[in-house]
C-alpha cells in the first residue's frame, strides 16, 4: 500500500511542470467557516507534493443544490465534501464520484463502521471518510459550581437540574427552533440512542417496527419535557443565536453538536465549557450519538484524475489524517482507525465520554424523506400545537406511505 501511494505521489511530482501551467485543483465544501483551517491543510499538501488545491466553500444551505448543478454542468470541483448515506450515495449513483474502493488505505485504515456511511448499494465507496461528529449538552462550569450542580447521570436528573436553574431565574437551555435543523439533528438525534439501538433502528427503517410504537411515543414525550426550559423567545432563536446566548452566559446549557466546541471554548467567549451526552432515562442503557459527518470525494470527470486520487490516498494514510487533525476545528472526530488526535485536543475527551455506550448515528439519515416532517413535528410540539402521540402517528403514516412506493 505504501509503495502504491509513493508511486501515485511520484506521478504527481513528475507532472509538476505541466501542473504549474494548468489550472489549480479545486475543493468544494459547505463549511465556509473552515476556510482558514482547510486552506492550511491544503497548503501542507502543496508543500509535500507541489500540487495546489484551492478551497471553494459554498453556504451550507445552498451546497447540495449548487454542487449538483456544477456536476450536471461539467464544471464541478475536482474534490468535494460528501454527505453520508443516501444523500452522498445519490451523486455516486449518478456517476459523479470516483469509486474510492481501490484508493490505497481506504479499506485498510478505516473500519467497516466508518465506511458504512460512505458505501453505496453496489459496494462502491463514494468518498474517503474524513470526520465524525457527536451531540452534547454543553454547560457553563461556573454556573454549575455556583449552584452546587453536578453533571446529571439520568434524564430525570437532567430535568431536575433544568428546574433548579429555572427556579433561580437562570435560563436552562439556549436552544430555539428558528433554524429548522438543530432541533432535530442536535437535540432529538442526541436523545434517540438512549432509547433505540443501532439494530432496532434498522427495524424501523425496514418497517418491521412502527414509528408510533411505545418507544417513539416515549421519545416524543421526553422531548416535550424539555420545552419549558427553552428561552421565552425560542421560536425566533436559531442555532447561531443560541450559541451566542450560551457563550455570553445568558443560559446555563446548550444542546448542540461537537463541532461547536471550538467556538464556544475559544477567545470569543469568557466561559469555562464542559460537555456531556444527553443522559438516558433511569433503567435504560446509555446511548451515544456518533455520526459520520462527511468525507472527501473525487470528481469522476476531473481533468486531473491522478492528482485527485493521490490526494484521496494521502487522506487515507495515518500521516495525512494526522495533518488533517491538526487543522480541522475542535470537535470533529477523525474517522481513521488510528490515534491521530493532537496533544491537548478535546477529541480524546469526547471519544472517552462515549465509551461503553450504545453508539449510533443520526436516526433519520437513511430515512431522509422524514427529515422535514420530523422538524415540523418537533416545532409543533414546542409551540404546543402537537402531542407526542400525534407526532408519532404523523411520522409513522408518512414512513409507511414512503415504504409502500
Language model: regions and residue ranges:
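Extracytoplasmic "Venus flytrap"/periplasmic binding protein-like
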Residues: 44-113, 117, 142-153, 252-253, ...
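Extracytoplasmic/periplasmic solute-binding protein
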Residues: 126-128, 135, 159-208, 251
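Hinge/lid segment of periplasmic solute-binding proteins
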Residues: 83-136, 150, 159, 165, ...
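Conserved C-terminal helix/tail region of periplasmic/extracytoplasmic solute-binding proteins
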Residues: 43, 52, 145, 321-322, ...
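C-terminal lobe and pocket-closing loops
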Residues: 89-90, 259-270, 281-376
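Glycine-centered hinge/linker elements that transmit conformational signals in sensory
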Residues: 164, 205-235
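Extracytoplasmic/periplasmic substrate-binding proteins
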Residues: 28, 87, 221-304
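A structural signal for short loop-to-beta-strand junctions that line the ligand-binding cleft
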Residues: 70, 77-78, 107-142, 171-179, ...
Amino acid at each position: 500500500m505504501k509503495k502504491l501511494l509513493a508511486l501515485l505521489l511520484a506521478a504527481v511530482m513528475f507532472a509538476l511542470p505541466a501542473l504549474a501551467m494548468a489550472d489549480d485543483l479545486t475543493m468544494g465544501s459547505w463549511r465556509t467557516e473552515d476556510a482558514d483551517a482547510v486552506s492550511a491543510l491544503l497548503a501542507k499538501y502543496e508543500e509535500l507534493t507541489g500540487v495546489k488545491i484551492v478551497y471553494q466553500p459554498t453556504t451550507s444551505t445552498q451546497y447540495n443544490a449548487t454542487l449538483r448543478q456544477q456536476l450536471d454542468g461539467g464544471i464541478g470541483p475536482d474534490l468535494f465534501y460528501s454527505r453520508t448515506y443516501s444523500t452522498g450515495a445519490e451523486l455516486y449513483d449518478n456517476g459523479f464520484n470516483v469509486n474510492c474502493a481501490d484508493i490505497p488505505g481506504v479499506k485498510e485504515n478505516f473500519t467497516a463502521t466508518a465506511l458504512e456511511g460512505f458505501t453505496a448499494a453496489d459496494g462502491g465507496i463514494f468518498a474517503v471518510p474524513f470526520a465524525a461528529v457527536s451531540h452534547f449538552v454543553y454547560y457553563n462550569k461556573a454556573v454549575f459550581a455556583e449552584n452546587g450542580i453536578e453533571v446529571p447521570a439520568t434524564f430525570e436528573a437532567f430535568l431536575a437540574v433544568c428546574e433548579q436553574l429555572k427556579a433561580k431565574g437562570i435560563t436552562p437551555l439556549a436552544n430555539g427552533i428558528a433554524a429548522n435543523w438543530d432541533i432535530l439533528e442536535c437535540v432529538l438525534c442526541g436523545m434517540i440512542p438512549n432509547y433505540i439501538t443501532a439494530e432496532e433502528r434498522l427495524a424501523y427503517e425496514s418497517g418491521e417496527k412502527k414509528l408510533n410504537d411505545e418507544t417513539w411515543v416515549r421519545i416524543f414525550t421526553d422531548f416535550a419535557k424539555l420545552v419549558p426550559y427553552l428561552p421565552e423567545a425560542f421560536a425566533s432563536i436559531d442555532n447561531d443565536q443560541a450559541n451566542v446566548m450560551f457563550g455570553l452566559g445568558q443560559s446555563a446549557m446548550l444542546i448542540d453538536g461537537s463541532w461547536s466546541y471550538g467556538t464556544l471554548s475559544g477567545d470569543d467567549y469568557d466561559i469555562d465549557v464542559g460537555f456531556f451526552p444527553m443522559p438516558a432515562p433511569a433503567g435504560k442503557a446509555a446511548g451515544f450519538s456518533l455520526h459520520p459527518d462527511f468525507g472527501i470525494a473525487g470528481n469522476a470527470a476531473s481533468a486531473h484524475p491522478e492528482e485527485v486520487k493521490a490526494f484521496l490516498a494521502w487522506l487515507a494514510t495515518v500521516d495525512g489524517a494526522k495533518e488533517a487533525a491538526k487543522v480541522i476545528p475542535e470537535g470533529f472526530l477523525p474517522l481513521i482507525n488510528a490515534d491521530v488526535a493532537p496533544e491537548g485536543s478535546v477529541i480524546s475527551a469526547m471519544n472517552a465520554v462515549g465509551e461503553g455506550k450504545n453508539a449510533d448515528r443520526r436516526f433519520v439519515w437513511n430515512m431522509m424523506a422524514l427529515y422535514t416532517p420530523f422538524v415540523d413535528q418537533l416545532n409543533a410540539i414546542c409551540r404546543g400545537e402537537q402531542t407526542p402521540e400525534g407526532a408519532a402517528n404523523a411520522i409513522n403514516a408518512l414512513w409507511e406511505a414512503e415504504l409502500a412506493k
